[in-house]
């Protein structure tokens, strides 16, 4: 059984995202003074007094206004309500009761869900009680004064919500974390459309206007018994085109989404090809050591395709993204669904490689084979590089420590050869791998190896 879900709703700019962040103990949704910053619904996990639940943050609800995005936001909020077991209705204690609050309360009363009213921005204890008293008029039970900024009243709010939620079996609460998949790319390459295709519903706002996803949006899905957390991110632009403000925070959030992911889907527009910004983004993924799949979207829109078209595209992409040549390529159409069914299988393969642990004996067999095929070149003084021993010291990404006579003797060409040999023999498709080089004399290497093996055995 999944964790119980609580939908957080309210009109724009009452502090819903700040409250969700306070409940979850993180700053995930973008918090800014501009109304309407949260456009999609964002999920966070909360733990309180031994109980675990999820909260879903929604965009600001406004009825009677069909301007750009508001119908989409209402649709997303209603979808969140359909999943939820209870609702936290957030109002602004400083501003007091408004006609928009009353309209929302009327709508909530017609929904088949219990509602708890959270009167946010009540920083003072006594004053907060007075501010909250005005909201009894909504007829939704006792209003709970709280402050998302300072944290007061949050415990009381959770205590008011918990009785409305089903108990969850411990084994369900202890399920392993889902695979985190960040969907990144430039604005308007089809990231949200791809997410919706993978989820099977219109989950993120899809619009031809670049930049319509402002937050890193998490969606939990399951495929063949495996859970995934899909993270749709704001499109990443060049710094010179980014104004300080919400878009700045969105791009920063997208980079953080890469950091908290297991694997990244780098979405490229088939019609535009690989741009400089795609290269920079790919570099960021490699730098962070994340598994990656290159997803070439809008393949249906490429005209005059023949049997050579994919090969030509592949060659160009490999040339321009040579530093992540280990990432598999998928040519898809989020619009028609072409080849999107292959994405989860590729994700599983990449994650398995990213988490792979190779026995020390196997590492050294591969090393000896590599040395037999091609010895390290000697320097001008005739001194030749020697590799005494190797072992894997880390995963995510796989990292190997090599004991050598002098790291400076191993130039970039030979290091690339060694990585290629490891990939050919150990199958690291979809993940970067790292080599660390340590200088050791032949006399000392035996002792260092024994010490390293002991530390690895104790893990």
UniProtKB/Swiss-Prot annotation:
Domain KH-like span(s) in chain numbering: 356-441
Keywords: GTP-binding, Nucleotide-binding, Repeat, Ribosome biogenesis
GO biological process, one term: ribosome biogenesis
Keyword GTP-binding: yes
Keyword Repeat: yes
Span of domain EngA-type G: 4-169, 179-355
Domain of life: Bacteria
Binding site for GTP 1: 10-17, 57-61, 120-123
InterPro entries: G_ENGA, GTP-bd, GTPase_Der, KH_dom-like, KH_dom-like_a/b, P-loop_NTPase, Small_GTP-bd
Functional description taken from the UniProt entry: GTPase that plays an essential role in the late steps of ribosome biogenesis.
PANTHER family: GTPASE DER (PTHR43834:SF6)
Record's subunit section: Associates with the 50S ribosomal subunit.
Record's protein name: GTPase Der
Organism from which the protein derives: Synechococcus sp. (strain JA-3-3Ab)
Name of the encoding gene: der
């Amino acid at each position: 059984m999944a964790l119980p879900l609580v939908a957080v709703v309210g009109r724009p700019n009452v502090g819903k995202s700040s409250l969700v962040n306070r409940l979850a103990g993180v700053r995930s949704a973008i918090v800014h003074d501009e109304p309407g910053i949260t456009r999609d619904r964002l999920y966070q996990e909360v733990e309180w007094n031994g109980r675990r639940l999820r909260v879903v943050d929604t965009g600001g609800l406004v009825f009677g206004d069909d301007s750009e995005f508001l119908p989409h936001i209402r649709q997303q909020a209603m979808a969140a309500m359909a999943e939820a077991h209870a609702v936290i209705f957030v109002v602004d204690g400083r501003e007091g009761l408004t006609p928009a609050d009353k309209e929302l309360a009327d709508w909530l009363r017609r929904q088949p869900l219990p509602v708890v009213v959270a009167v946010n921005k009540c920083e003072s204890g006594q004053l907060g009680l007075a501010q909250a008293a005005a909201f009894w008029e909504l007829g939704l039970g006792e209003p709970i004064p709280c402050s998302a900024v300072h944290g007061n009243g949050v415990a009381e709010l959770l205590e008011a919500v918990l009785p409305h939620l089903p108990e969850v079996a411990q084994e369900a609460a202890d399920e392993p974390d889902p695979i985190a998949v960040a969907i990144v790319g430039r604005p308007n390459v089809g990231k949200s459309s791809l997410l919706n295709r993978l989820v099977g519903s219109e989950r993120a706002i899809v619009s031809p206007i670049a930049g319509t996803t402002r937050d890193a949006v998490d969606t939990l899905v399951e495929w063949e018994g495996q859970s995934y957390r899909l993270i749709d991110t704001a499109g990443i632009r060049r710094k010179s085109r980014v104004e300080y403000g919400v878009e700045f925070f969105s791009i920063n959030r997208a980079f953080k989404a890469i950091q908290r992911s297991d694997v990244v889907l780098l979405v490229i527009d088939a019609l535009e090809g690989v741009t400089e910004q795609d290269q920079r983004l790919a570099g960021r993924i490699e730098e962070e050591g994340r598994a990656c799949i290159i997803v070439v979207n809008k393949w249906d829109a490429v005209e005059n395709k023949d049997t050579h078209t994919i090969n030509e595209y592949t060659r160009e992409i490999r040339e321009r993204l040579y530093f992540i040549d280990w990432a598999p390529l998928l040519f898809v159409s989020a619009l028609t669904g072409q080849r999107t069914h292959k994405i989860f299988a590729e994700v599983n393969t990449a994650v398995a490689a990213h988490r792979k642990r190779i026995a020390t004996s196997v590492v050294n067999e591969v090393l000896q084979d590599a040395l037999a095929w091609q010895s390290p070149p000697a320097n001008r003084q005739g001194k030749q590089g020697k590799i005494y021993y190797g072992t894997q010291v880390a995963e995510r990404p796989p990292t190997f420590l090599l004991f050598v006579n002098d790291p400076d003797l191993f130039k970039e060409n030979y290091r690339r050869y060694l990585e290629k040999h490891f990939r050919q023999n150990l199958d690291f498709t979809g993940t970067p791998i790292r080599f660390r080089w340590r200088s050791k004399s032949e006399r000392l290497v035996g002792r260092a190896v024994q010490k390293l093996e002991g530390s690895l055995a104790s893990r």
